[in-house]
């Protein structure tokens, strides 16, 4: 998906940066619950949400979002105040298979799932406070 990130431009054509964490020992479904909280938000707001989210996966997602923001700032000289979480997704990594002994010689298989977390931040102009809640007048029909 985000492999199209060439020379600091996202797929939308905006300047940005990418970071990913691979083989993270958290279930992809649990990580996706956390990722959905921050998609489309500003980086500062996303980091605040992740800092106080009760899910265990929020720590791993926090590190990746912070790393993507640092990549944008250091590698592409982008202003941290204009960064937004543009694209964020979780792919399934390899599954570690373990055995749990059960009664009468049986064994149950335990699947320890891993995830690949990818975050793409992009630089957008901040929305002004007046533009966000401004009312537009409609003509009478």
Swiss-Prot record:
Function of the protein: This protein binds specifically to 23S rRNA; its binding is stimulated by other ribosomal proteins, e.g. L4, L17, and L20. It is important during the early stages of 50S assembly. It makes multiple contacts with different domains of the 23S rRNA in the assembled 50S subunit and ribosome. The globular domain of the protein is located near the polypeptide exit tunnel on the outside of the subunit, while an extended beta-hairpin is found that lines the wall of the exit tunnel in the center of the 70S ribosome.
Recorded superkingdom: Bacteria
Gene3D superfamilies associated with the record: Ribosomal protein L22/L17 (3.90.470.10)
Alphabetical list of InterPro entries matching this protein: Ribosomal_uL22, Ribosomal_uL22_bac/chlpt-type, Ribosomal_uL22_bac/org-type, Ribosomal_uL22_CS, Ribosomal_uL22_sf
NCBIfam families: rplV_bact (TIGR01044)
Protein name as it appears in the record: Large ribosomal subunit protein uL22
Subunit organization: Part of the 50S ribosomal subunit.
Organism, scientific name: Frankia alni (strain DSM 45986 / CECT 9034 / ACN14a)
GO MF annotation list: rRNA binding; structural constituent of ribosome
SUPFAM superfamilies xref list: Ribosomal protein L22 (SSF54843)
Entry keywords, A to Z: Ribonucleoprotein, Ribosomal protein, RNA-binding, rRNA-binding
Keyword Transit peptide belongs to the record: no
GO CC terms: cytosolic large ribosomal subunit
Similarity comment text for this entry: Belongs to the universal ribosomal protein uL22 family.
Gene name linked to the record: rplV
Name of one Pfam family that matches: Ribosomal_L22
Keyword Iron-sulfur: no
Gene Ontology biological process: translation
